[in-house]
């Protein structure tokens, strides 16, 4: 009918947690399991209409998230409990909604973000783990976390990360601004915590791969600075495994007032 008004459109942001070990990454792909596909299916069931989500960062196969942020638009008016408890009831057990927030029209999960934060968890023990095997990377040689931390500080600020960039990276520029990078030990766990405005493909895992060589005393502390200056991926160490990597937080301007739950992974003290 010509005089009929269109339904209002709501923009919703969600915080998402997932164990990426059984998925071929975040992004929806044909004939393989993806986190995006499972989330969109659950949201569509609750909204009773097709839902497409946009995420803050597309994680690779096997990589986890405790602080992923997505947004979507819908004409379905639902209570917050529907977008949390209701969606979780329709999700597989290894994906969960952590929070929901109605956001203004100019919010975008990817383009409004000012920084992303990752944590890489290394289980540094002579014997391999079992229960947490898909949530940590096992490294059996003793690691000097303080040495790794000192070596990593040269990565702070705006730099060309070509030496730590995957060959297939499609980003237009290798330049990124690292705001902090800390390496700490928590019992048998060594945690690499890194925050940047954005990351080139495999950047965290490539940095960790080289830091492991420093931590095991196979390379001097100065090696990381030398790699950074060389701008040559072939000189750096192998890419660290996906299992230990978590997207733990995404920063946005305060005006969006998004929730900030503990970053995790939740088996570690925050």
Curated annotation (Swiss-Prot):
What positions does UniProt annotate as the active site of this protein?
60
UniProt-annotated binding residues for substrate: 118
**EC class (word):** isomerase
Q: In which domain of life is the source organism classified?
A: Bacteria
Isomerase as a keyword?
A: yes
Q: Which GO terms describe its biological process?
A: tRNA pseudouridine synthesis
Q: Name one Pfam family in it.
A: PseudoU_synth_1
Q: Which UniProt keywords apply?
A: Isomerase, tRNA processing
**Enzyme nomenclature, EC number:** 5.4.99.12
According to the UniProt entry, its GO molecular function terms are: RNA binding; tRNA pseudouridine(38-40) synthase activity
In the UniProt record, the signal sequence range is none
What is the reaction catalyzed?
uridine(38/39/40) in tRNA = pseudouridine(38/39/40) in tRNA
Q: Which NCBIfam families match?
A: hisT_truA (TIGR00071)
Per its database record, what is this protein's job?
Formation of pseudouridine at positions 38, 39 and 40 in the anticodon stem and loop of transfer RNAs.
Q: How does it assemble?
A: Homodimer.
* Family statement drawn from the similarity comment of this UniProt entry: Belongs to the tRNA pseudouridine synthase TruA family.
Protein name per the record: tRNA pseudouridine synthase A
Which organism is this protein's natural source?
Salmonella paratyphi B (strain ATCC BAA-1250 / SPB7)
């Amino acid at each position: 009918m010509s005089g009929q008004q269109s339904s209002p459109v709501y923009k919703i942001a969600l915080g998402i947690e997932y164990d990426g070990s059984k998925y071929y990454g975040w992004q929806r792909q044909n004939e393989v399991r993806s986190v995006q596909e499972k989330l969109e299916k659950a949201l569509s069931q609750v909204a009773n209409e097709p839902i497409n989500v946009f995420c803050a960062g597309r994680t690779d196969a096997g990589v986890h998230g405790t602080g992923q942020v997505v947004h979507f638009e819908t004409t379905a008016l639902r209570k917050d409990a529907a977008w949390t408890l209701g969606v979780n009831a329709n999700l597989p057990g290894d994906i969960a909604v952590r929070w929901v927030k109605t956001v203004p029209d100019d919010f975008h999960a990817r383009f409004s973000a000012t920084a992303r934060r990752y944590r890489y968890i290394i289980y540094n023990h002579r014997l391999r783990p079992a229960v947490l095997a898909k949530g940590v990377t096992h490294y059996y040689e003793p690691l000097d976390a303080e040495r790794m931390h000192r070596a990593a500080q040269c990565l702070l600020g705006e730099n060309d990360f070509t030496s730590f960039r995957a060959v297939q990276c499609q980003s237009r520029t290798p330049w990124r601004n690292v705001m902090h990078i800390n390496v700490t030990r928590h019992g048998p766990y060594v945690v690499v915590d890194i925050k940047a405005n954005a990351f080139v493909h495999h950047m965290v895992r490539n940095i960790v791969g080289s830091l492991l060589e420093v931590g095991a005393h196979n390379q001097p502390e100065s090696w990381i600075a030398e790699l950074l200056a060389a701008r040559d991926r072939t000189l750096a160490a192998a890419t660290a495994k996906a299992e230990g990597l978590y997207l733990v937080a995404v920063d946005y301007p305060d005006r969006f007032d998004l929730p900030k739950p503990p970053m995790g992974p939740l088996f570690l003290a925050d």
